[in-house]
Curated annotation (Swiss-Prot):
The gene is murC. Pathway: Cell wall biogenesis; peptidoglycan biosynthesis. The lineage of its organism: Bacteria, Pseudomonadati, Pseudomonadota, Gammaproteobacteria, Lysobacterales. Pfam families: Mur_ligase, Mur_ligase_C, Mur_ligase_M. It comes from Xylella fastidiosa (strain Temecula1 / ATCC 700964). ATP binds at residues 122-128. This is UDP-N-acetylmuramate--L-alanine ligase. Its EC number is 6.3.2.8. GO terms for molecular function: ATP binding; UDP-N-acetylmuramate-L-alanine ligase activity.
């Protein structure tokens, strides 16, 4: 049936049924939740069940396990994750039925069409920065809508439909899809050589993409750029838009001075334009999180949030799931305990920042890391950097690479990485084939008082949660 647009004055309601292929992905669940709240009939499919899909089901979404052509029958639009193959039966059926198919980023752009968009781009720190911006604007009474790649612990979700005019989102550079967005404010945290496989293994193309991202701002838009990152600093002269800088760098427009770490907190002086200076306590560890907080402070200042309200939001921020998530002290037998931290970090630069935060907060503890590399291509491209940063810890357990759909690459697996680390002569890594085997191996590595970091973007986080849930009964798989 051909429907006339004039038959329904509300164009959003004219095509109410939206189906998400790969609905369980971090970038998909938030969009689905916002569309549910807007009143759409949301359905979705995924090969795996997780907490996010279960939450969507409780909110009214129809979530199917596995992919089938029948799942898209009767839908008005199909939203597809970048992880979905072109021969997926649901996509093939949608094409045959001439159902509109939209990439995830394109649907995010559609949501942004009706609000003032704030898009956070960068190789690292997007989720934390986006979350901090949402927290600052919420504390300032602006009630933003947000779509985040991780769970905002205070909200218990990674998305929320607010009544205000601002929409805060992550802008994903990994596949170039951030170039679909047309924000009013663009934040760039840093630029690093990651996801090179999507840019012809050419770092210059990644940098060019960020330049193009800023050109998508309207002439009255604003680019917020981190001056501490040398690649981002180069964008200041290329942006051709209004620019505000932030950083610990003394030349930044919004900057931090007197930065000190106090356990899991960072204390610093926030210096805002017009000479406003306030003391800030950030409830997150690490200098990298100070930079993330400065980005949020700059956005808040631009939108009129009072400085003291910005400071209050930063102090009360309780974090995001799997971003230096302190799971507390856990027993490892014989009355001994270790401190367990779960973190999503999976790039050498992220590992370096997390290790620095851990040592800064707990300098007297032995640093033990259980790491699951993510993607064979990243392990290959960053091989030497991984070996360097992982050789700096006191004890290391490696699981096999989480493939994320990739086929193994010779010389880019956990055993090869362990050999490279061992050759540096600073540590003797332990290698396990399956990530679940960490539960068996860790008791022999850990000592009383250790700080245990479980890190990676694959499924290692579920092992950390399993240990917590089972009361840290090691030795059972």
């Amino acid at each position: 049936m051909i429907r006339r647009l004039q038959d329904n004055g509300d164009l959003i309601r004219a095509f109410p049924r939206v189906h998400f292929v790969g609905i369980g992905g971090a970038g998909m669940t938030g969009i689905a939740e916002v569309m549910l709240t807007l009143g759409y009939e949301v359905s979705g499919s995924d090969n795996a069940d997780n907490a996010a899909t279960r939450r969507l089901a409780t909110l009214g979404a129809r979530v199917m396990r596995g992919h089938s052509a029948a799942n898209v029958l009767g839908t008005d639009c199909v939203v597809v994750s970048s992880a979905i193959r072109e021969d997926n039966p649901e996509l093939m059926e949608a094409r045959s039925q001439r159902i509109p198919i939209m990439p995830r980023a394109a649907m995010l752009a559609e949501l942004m069409r009706f609000r003032h968009g704030i898009a956070v781009a960068g190789t690292h720190g997007k989720t934390t920065t986006t979350s901090l911006i949402a927290a600052v604007l919420s504390e300032g009474g602006l009630d933003p809508t947000f779509v985040i790649g991780g769970q905002l612990l205070a909200a218990g979700a990674n998305a929320k439909l607010g009544a205000g005019q601002w929409l805060v989102v992550e802008a994903d550079e990994s596949d170039g899809s951030f170039l679909r967005l047309n924000p009013l404010v663009a934040v760039v945290t840093n630029i690093d050589a990651d996801h090179l496989e999507n840019y012809g293994n050419d770092f210059s193309r990644i940098k060019d993409a960020f330049t193009e991202f800023l050109q998508r701002l309207p002439f009255y838009g604003l680019a917020l750029l981190c001056l501490d990152d040398p690649e981002v600093a180069e964008l200041v002269g290329k942006a051709r838009r209004h620019v505000m800088t932030y950083g610990i760098d003394a030349a930044a427009d919004v900057r931090a001075e007197d930065v000190v770490q106090d356990g899991a907190r960072m204390c610093f002086t926030l210096c805002l334009p017009e000479g406003k200076v306030i003391p800030v306590t950030l409830a997150l560890p690490g200098r990298h999180n100070v930079l993330n907080a400065l980005a949020a402070s700059a956005v808040g200042w631009q939108l009129g949030v009072p400085p003291e309200v910005i400071g209050r939001a930063l102090k009360s921020f309780v974090g995001i799931g799997r971003r230096f998530n302190d799971l507390g002290d856990v027993a490892i037998g014989n009355g001994a305990c270790v401190r367990l931290i779960d973190d999503y970090g999976h790039h050498p630069r992220e590992l370096e920042a997390v290790f620095a935060a851990a040592r800064g907060g707990w300098p007297d503890k032995r640093l033990v890391v259980a790491f699951q590399p993510h993607r064979y291509s990243r392990t290959r491209d960053q091989f030497d950097a991984f070996a360097a940063v992982l050789s700096s810890v006191d004890a290391l357990v490696l699981s096999e690479v989480y493939p994320a759909g990739e086929v193994p690459i010779p010389g880019a697996d956990a055993k090869a990485l362990a050999r490279a680390i061992r050759a540096r002569g600073r540590s003797e890594p332990v290698v396990v084939g399956q990530v679940a085997s960490l539960i068996d191996v860790l008791p022999d590595v850990l000592q009383e008082g250790d700080l245990l970091l479980m890190m990676g973007a694959g499924d290692i986080g579920s092992i950390a949660q399993r240990i917590v849930h089972d009361g840290f009964v090691f030795g059972e798989v």
